[in-house]
Amino acid sequence: MADGLTKSAARNIFYGGSLFFFLLFAALTAHSHWYMVNKSTDNEGLTESVVAGKHIWEKNMCINCHSIMGEGAYFAPELSNVWERYGGHQNPEAARAGLAAWIRAQPLGTQGRRQMPAYDFTDEEMSSLIDFLEWTDGIDDQDWPPHPAG
C-alpha cells in the first residue's frame, strides 16, 4: 500500500464529496421551496385585492424607503407588522381607517423628520394597499421584525 493518497483515491473523494454536497444543496433547496409554498405563505388570503395592493406597492416604489420582513430600505419604518401596530387584529375597521388617514396625511411637514411623499390614491387603491399590508402581517415571518415598533 502506498504511503500517501493515490490519484484514484483523491479523485474518488473529490467526486464523492462533490456528489454528496450537490445532493445536500438540492435537498435544502427543495425543502426551502416547500417551506415557502406550504408553510410561510398565506395562499388562502392572497386575493385579487392583495395582488393589486402589491402592484401599488411596487408601482410607487414604497420599498425604496420602507421594508417588509427585512427586505427593502431602512429609511422609513418596517411595514410587515403595521397591521398589528394599528390594532388590526382587535379592530380591523379602525386600523383600516387609521392607516388610510396616515397615508393621506403625508407629508406631515415636521421639521427635522424624514417625510413620506404625498400619494393621491383612489379609495380602491388605498383599500388594496391596506389589504396587502394586512396580508403581509399574516405571513409567518419567524418573529420579524425583532422590535414591535418595526
Curated annotation (Swiss-Prot):
Domain of life of the source: Bacteria
Transmembrane residue ranges: 13-29
Topological type in the membrane: Single-pass membrane protein
Binding site for heme c: 62, 65-66
Keyword annotations from UniProtKB, A to Z: Cell membrane, Electron transport, Heme, Iron, Membrane, Metal-binding, Respiratory chain, Signal-anchor, Transmembrane, Transmembrane helix, Transport
InterPro entries: Cyt_c-like_dom (IPR009056), Cyt_c-like_dom_sf (IPR036909)
Gene3D superfamilies: Cytochrome c-like domain (1.10.760.10)
Major place of residence: membrane
Location relative to the cell: Cell membrane
Heme as UniProt keyword: yes
GO MF entries: electron transfer activity; heme binding; metal ion binding
Subunit relationships: Heterodimer of cytochromes b (large subunit) and c (small subunit).
Protein name: Nitric oxide reductase subunit C
Gene name of the encoded protein: norC
